[in-house]
């Protein structure tokens, strides 16, 4: 795959007031953001990002999974329309489904296999096929050495992890210390979620953990290892902190978290040193998300002003 900077940004589009895609791509370039996550193959965005050298993660949305799982021909058609049609785009991954849950999980591995087969047949096997999971699939996340999937998640994650190991692809996970903390603020010091703890909070054998981000990443590694995925890398497909709409959701806290995230991911975790490929959620505040914190994850307002200053 193309070389990657450790930090990208998720370009979500659940809003009716965003700038044109070509303008957004210019904002990525101006701010030195080298990687972009798209949740679906948006034509305007893919046309605009072609030839820029920006690495792209493109989603095959949840509503196409059953179709992609049902037939290799459907997957080949999807790849032709959404990948091969954009030869100038530096595609890095196709992310098949985002936080797929319930009965739909039965389509995950068949869809991933069919998309992978279609990419290989098109001479595009360097574009890896993965899926993006929620941190909620971890039944145990602390200490990281005890990390494991919930019983329900283990049933579908075993085959997912084994497919990723076979194809040398990473698992993508959406990791939100804010949400874990806000769910039960009395159970955890906010500094541990915010990259602001003064020392080791969780001691795990020889390893000391100062922040919940590292704890969660390493718990995912332990959980994957229990299902034949000890060779699989983790990519953080979303992380961030909201600037409004909820408890401790302020521009100052959001800036503190995201700036520390950017500065931190180049170093890795206690158990897995080295850069962690990470995508900040999100480029913009999105006004068609649920009210509250969901509308307030953006680095920018739709008018292109910074919600708070940040340095990539």
Curated annotation (Swiss-Prot):
The UniProt keywords, alphabetically, are:
Glycoprotein, Glycosidase, Hydrolase, Signal
Q: What Enzyme Commission number(s) apply to this enzyme?
A: 3.2.1.73
Q: Which family does it belong to?
A: Belongs to the glycosyl hydrolase 17 family.
Give the function comment from the record. Functions in plant cell wall hydrolysis during mobilization of the endosperm in germinating grain or during the growth of vegetative tissues.
InterPro entries in the record: Glyco_hydro_17, Glyco_hydro_17_plant, Glycoside_hydrolase_SF
Q: Which organism is it from?
A: Hordeum vulgare (Barley)
- Pathway(s) it belongs to: Glycan metabolism; beta-D-glucan degradation
Organism classification: Eukaryota, Viridiplantae, Streptophyta, Embryophyta, Tracheophyta
Q: Which PROSITE patterns match?
A: GLYCOSYL_HYDROL_F17 (PS00587)
Q: What is the designated name of this protein?
A: Lichenase-2
The residues forming the signal peptide are 1-6
Please give one Pfam family short name: Glyco_hydro_17
Q: Which GO terms describe its molecular function?
A: licheninase activity
Q: Does the keyword Signal apply?
A: yes
